[in-house]
From Swiss-Prot:
PANTHER family: MITOCHONDRIAL COENZYME A DIPHOSPHATASE NUDT8, NUDIX HYDROLASE. This is Uncharacterized Nudix hydrolase NudL. Residues 29-160 form the Nudix hydrolase domain. It comes from Salmonella newport (strain SL254). CDD domains: NUDIX_CoAse_Nudt7 (cd03426). Gene3D superfamilies: Nucleoside Triphosphate Pyrophosphohydrolase. Keywords: Hydrolase, Magnesium, Manganese, Metal-binding. GO terms for molecular function: coenzyme A diphosphatase activity; magnesium ion binding; manganese ion binding. Mg(2+) binds at E83, E87. GO terms for biological process: nucleoside diphosphate metabolic process.
Length: 192
């Protein structure tokens, strides 16, 4: 599938046609969720954040809004929506959730569930300075181009795992964020 002319309707029909298979087994017990905010435009965008530099984990990294599930969250989707509101001021009622991707294991011991949602283009999103240093929009068509991601095999604690790397403008997109974007591309039928 060629992503260069990806419209929102095409993305939605492909995502809903090819439902994710939730067969992923994990040993992780801690749950987290991220929102993949797709901006409703004829040529859709993807809202991403850059984490604040003072954070203990993943400082300065490009990420989706999200975080750990807490005891007040009714579901993984509720956790993703709460975190998106806290981090970038996206009201939960403004998000049209269209589905979830299979969970991904993080190197920090979380099982992370990506929640795909459509958001209006005119939301006055803003970064929570405690958690986020920047909020930016990337064209969805570019984010889903598999050729933009480059593999790097990393050895950590005696184990090898593959990390994906990419750039968008001056932002370095890698790790879990790049992996989730690749999984989303594969989910809608983009061929490697």
């Amino acid at each position: 599938m060629d992503t260069s002319r990806l419209t929102l309707n095409h993305f939605l029909s492909r995502f809903q046609l090819l439902r994710p298979q939730m067969t992923h087994e994990t040993l992780n017990q801690r749950q987290a969720a991220v929102l993949i905010p797709v901006v409703r435009r004829p040529q859709p965008g993807l809202l991403l954040t850059q984490r604040a530099i003072h954070l203990r984990k993943h400082a300065g990294q490009v990420a989706f809004p999200g975080g750990a599930v807490d005891s007040t969250d009714a579901s993984l989707i509720a956790a993703a929506l709460r975190e998106a509101q806290e981090e970038v001021a996206i009201p939960p009622q403004a998000v049209e959730v269209i589905g979830v991707l299979p969970p991904v294991d993080s190197v920090t011991g979380f099982q992370v569930t990506p929640v795909v949602g459509i958001i209006p283009p005119n939301l006055p999103w803003r970064a929570s300075e405690d958690e986020v240093s920047a909020v930016f929009e990337m064209p969805l068509a570019q984010a889903l181009q598999l050729g933009r991601y480059h593999p790097l095999d990393v050895y950590r604690r005696g184990n090898s795992h593959r990390v994906w790397l990419s750039w968008y403008e001056h932002y370095f997109v890698w790790g879990m964020t790049a992996n989730i974007l690749r999984e989303l591309a594969l989910q809608i039928g983009v061929k490697p």
